[in-house]
Amino acid sequence: MNIKEINILKKCAKNVLQFSRFVKILTNHGLDDFRPYSFQKKLLDKFSDGLKPESAGRRNHIVIAPRQCGKTTIIAIYALWYMIFNPDKSVAIMSYKLDAAKEILYKIREIYCNLPEFIKPAATINNNKILKFENNSYIIAVACSSNAMIKGRSIDLLIADEAAFMRKSDFDNFLMSVFPTQASRRDAQMILISTPHGIDHGFYEIWKKAINSENSFVPSKIRWNCVPYRNEEWKERIIRECGDIFFRQEYAVEFIGSK
C-alpha cells in the first residue's frame, strides 16, 4: 500500500461518504460507480453522525421510504463501512423472512468483492449467512421470527429492513427480547427501515413516538420523488395503473389503516 492509498484509507475511515466513492454496484448496464441520490447522502451522514460520542442519545434511526428507491444499497454500504473500519463489531441484518435478510447480505458481499484491494479487508468467513473480516468484525443475516439467534447477544449494529412487514407478534417479541439489550448500551446502534404497512403494528408506534420526540429514534421520511425520474407524470401513471391507496402507501409513505 502506497502513501496515497494510506491517506485515502484514513479519509474513508472517518467519512462514510468518502468510502462510498469507491463503491461499485450492479445496474442494468453492468458494474457501475455508486452515484448517490441526495437522500442517500443525507441518510449515510445521519447514520454515521449517530456514532459520535456527543450523539449518544440519538444513535437509533427509523426510516420510512418508498419502494425501489435505493434504500437497500444504503443499508449495505453503511453496514460494510461500519465493519471495515470498526474492529471487533457485530452486525445483524434482520428482515421479515430469512431470504430477504440474505439478499441484503448478498448485496453487502457483492459490494465488498468489488472494492479496491487496498480498501478490502481479508474475509475469514464469507457465505450466505455470515461475513467476517480479519479485524474480527462480522455480519449475520437473520429472520425476525428467529431472533433467538441474537437475543441477549451484544449486537453493535442492528438493522431491521422492511420492519413494518414483520409479523406483528414477531416484531413485538423482537422489541421485548432484543431492544432492552440494545438500549442498555450507549455505543450500540439500531436502524429500523421500511415502507409503511398499516398502523396496527409496533413499527408505526415507534415512528409516531419518534416524530414527537418521545423516544430515542431519529425519524427520516424519504419522499416519493427522491428518485430523479419520479415526476408528476410518473406519479399519475402509477395512480392510474395501481390506484391512489397503493401510491399513497407504497410511494408517498403514508400509514394507512385502522386500529
Tell me what each language-model feature is.
Residues 1-259:
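Short, flexible loop motifs at catalytic/binding sites
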